[in-house]
């Protein structure tokens, strides 16, 4: 099956988590917006004939299925791409971890747009500075510390055990994103999460 990934052409964003899984598995897929432009994504969202219309990208077309929301897409793709545990409990555990990553993505976004997404970063700098301070003081230690604990208890080198899963790829992308957005803060913090960084390096 050839998958179709719909996102925006100029940013990695939430679409990158899906893209990483497709690339890791060597899946047959087309990155629609990067091939045909953003109008293709907008057109799919606006299509009135859909019984279950997607709210926003990323969106994956898999045959007749149209699946939206990053964690939902990965929950579908994981077993099919060999990037998820085989048993139901393991698949739900991977999904639970991905949903936690989804929460973290929202918090990272809000450090730059704490007031509203409709304003430019430059229009909300004071609020962004405050949000960033709280983010690094409270949220990063709690959430990345949680993943450090998960790795310590997983029984292997990966979040779900001994095999690479889509959640490992997503945590890799989180580290990459934090290094890009907050290079100095992340460099200081990394010594507190050696297992997470080791996972990043393995991926």
Predicted regions located by residue number:
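Non-transmembrane alpha-helical segments in soluble domains
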Residues: 19, 74, 78, 95-98, ...
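Domain-wide signal for the mature, well-folded portions of proteins, strongly enriched
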Residues: 15, 112-115, 119, 141, ...
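Structural helix-adjacent loops and short alpha-helical linkers that scaffold large soluble proteins
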Residues: 85-88, 185-191
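GST-like domain detector, emphasizing the conserved glutathione-binding G-site
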Residues: 1-134, 153, 159
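GST superfamily/GST-like fold recognition
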Residues: 94, 159-184, 192-197, 203
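Amphipathic alpha-helical packing segments from all-alpha helical-bundle domains
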Residues: 133-152
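Glycine-rich, acidic and aromatic/proline-enriched surface loops and short helix-turn segments
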Residues: 103, 149, 177
């Amino acid at each position: 099956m050839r998958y179709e990934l719909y996102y925006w052409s100029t940013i990695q964003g939430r679409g990158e988590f899906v893209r990483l899984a497709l690339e890791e598995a060597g899946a047959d897929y087309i990155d629609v917006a990067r091939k045909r432009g953003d109008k293709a994504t907008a057109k799919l969202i606006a299509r009135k004939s859909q019984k279950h219309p997607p709210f926003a990208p990323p969106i994956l077309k898999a045959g007749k299925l149209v699946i939206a929301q990053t964690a939902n897409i990965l929950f579908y793709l994981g077993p099919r791409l060999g990037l998820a545990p085989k048993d139901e409990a393991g698949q739900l555990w991977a999904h639970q971890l991905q949903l936690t990553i989804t929460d973290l993505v929202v918090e990272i976004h809000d450090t730059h747009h704490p007031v509203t997404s409709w304003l430019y970063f430059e229009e909300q700098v004071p609020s962004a500075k405050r949000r960033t301070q709280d983010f690094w003081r409270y949220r990063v230690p709690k959430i990345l510390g949680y993943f450090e604990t998960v790795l310590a208890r997983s029984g292997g080198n990966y979040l779900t055990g001994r095999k690479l899963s889509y959640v490992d790829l997503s945590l890799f992308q989180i580290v990459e994103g934090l290094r890009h957005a907050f290079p100095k803060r992340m460099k200081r913090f990394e010594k507190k999460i050696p297992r997470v960084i080791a996972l990043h390096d393995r991926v």
